[in-house]
Amino acid sequence: MDWWINARIATLDPDAQHAYGLLESHALGVAHGKVEAIVPMSEWDGDASDNITDANGRLITPGLVDCHTHLVYGGDRAAEFEMRLQGVSYADIAKQGGGIISTVRATRAATEKELLQQSEKRLLALLREGVTTVEIKSGYGLDLESELKMLHVARRLGQRYPVNVRTTLLAAHALPPEYAGRSDDYISWICEEALPVAHEQKLADAVDVFCESIAFTPEQCRRVFEAAQKLGLPVKGHMEQLTLSGGSALAAEFNALSVDHVEYLDEASVQAIAASGTVATLLPGAFYFLRETQRPPMELLRKHKVPMALATDLNPGSCPLASMRLMMNMGCTFFGMTPEETLAGVTRHGAKALGMQDRIGHLAPGMAADFIVWDCQHPAQLSYEFGVTGPHQRVFHGEIHNV
């Protein structure tokens, strides 16, 4: 048995009666990659054969879960960022070949090796801040070869580094140039070719859509969801980011894992996702980077007890920010979340948004031994401070993996 002793443990146990599920002066026992026991130090009786690490009063939390990223992509859009700051409109940038299509071109042109090398830098930035589980979407290929290439890279990242990687097929992200004016045909291609092939090759753990006036209609997204459902794949969606599209209510019909962004959710939609057990994933980094003003309906989400996850939305266009700790601070400062809500959002609720709540996201006997020993004592510091208190140890499947 491996033990971490003299620790303050924020278990994030959903059944805990006290804030953060915080346990003072406890020991955490690990065996075979799972949590074996959590006991008060007054009851701990270590064996001479045990491997013991003294936390010296440090805080232990579950490993962080980034449940919404687009971290596999080619190129960057720094020049476009500069143009926007100089007053050039997004429409004009797009006319000059910028916007999402510029990332599609760069991603299509990159070899799998090049894409892996570019993407692993972004992944490592997340791991160094305490992430032990990450979701990675496709969506910058928009043709079969390139979408599969992105998903292959995501799988390889999970094999190469100490992190759980969940992959999501997001072919319904934007309309590729070759389908201009034929969005229904593109949706047919997703349903009849891209989705079945990705599923057959075991490259997709879930299916995502972008339901918005600038992307795809609820009717088109329904077709994708129905095709995913037939294959037994869970669904999720970029919903209500720019307008009230009805996408979240649609997602609730399919018991979606999550609806993400959700700045324009109305109460009827909140009630629908509450009834379906769907997580609302909040993405304050995109809100900040795009200088939006409409924040998610926090009081409605609380009123109807919708679990709120928090994620980076790491992507080249609207949030090139690889920091979960920054997202926690932004969740508090921009969206009015409490530090306890943000920590639950990047652990327990993030796990639920990936359908992994039975394995990760809180600390209890039988759960995966994915946790962080922090150089701080109180969990509120993780949202309060940024760039100050980092991981002292990063434990993945019961083994120390500092990266």
Swiss-Prot record:
Residues holding Fe(3+): H68, H70, H238, D313
EC number(s) per entry: 3.5.2.7
Residues noted as binding 4-imidazolone-5-propanoate in the record, renumbered to the chain: R77, Y140, H173, Q241, S318
Domain of life: Bacteria
Lineage of the organism: Bacteria, Pseudomonadati, Pseudomonadota, Gammaproteobacteria, Oceanospirillales
GO molecular function: imidazolonepropionase activity; iron ion binding; zinc ion binding
Stated role: Catalyzes the hydrolytic cleavage of the carbon-nitrogen bond in imidazolone-5-propanoate to yield N-formimidoyl-L-glutamate. It is the third step in the universal histidine degradation pathway.
Subcellular location: Cytoplasm
Gene that encodes it: hutI
Any one GO BP annotation for this protein: L-histidine catabolic process to glutamate and formate
Chain positions recorded as Zn(2+) binding sites: H68, H70, H238, D313
Cofactor: Zn(2+); Fe(3+)
Pathway involvement of the protein, from the record: Amino-acid degradation; L-histidine degradation into L-glutamate; N-formimidoyl-L-glutamate from L-histidine: step 3/3
Family: Belongs to the metallo-dependent hydrolases superfamily. HutI family.
Record keywords: Cytoplasm, Histidine metabolism, Hydrolase, Iron, Metal-binding, Zinc
Cofactor note: Binds 1 zinc or iron ion per subunit.
Protein name listed in UniProt: Imidazolonepropionase
Binding sites annotated in the UniProt record for N-formimidoyl-L-glutamate: Y140, N315, G317
Record's GO cellular component terms: cytoplasm
Reactions catalysed: 4-imidazolone-5-propanoate + H2O = N-formimidoyl-L-glutamate
InterPro entries, per the entry: Amidohydro-rel (IPR006680), HutI (IPR005920), Metal-dep_hydrolase_composite (IPR011059), Metal_Hydrolase (IPR032466)
CDD domains: Imidazolone-5PH
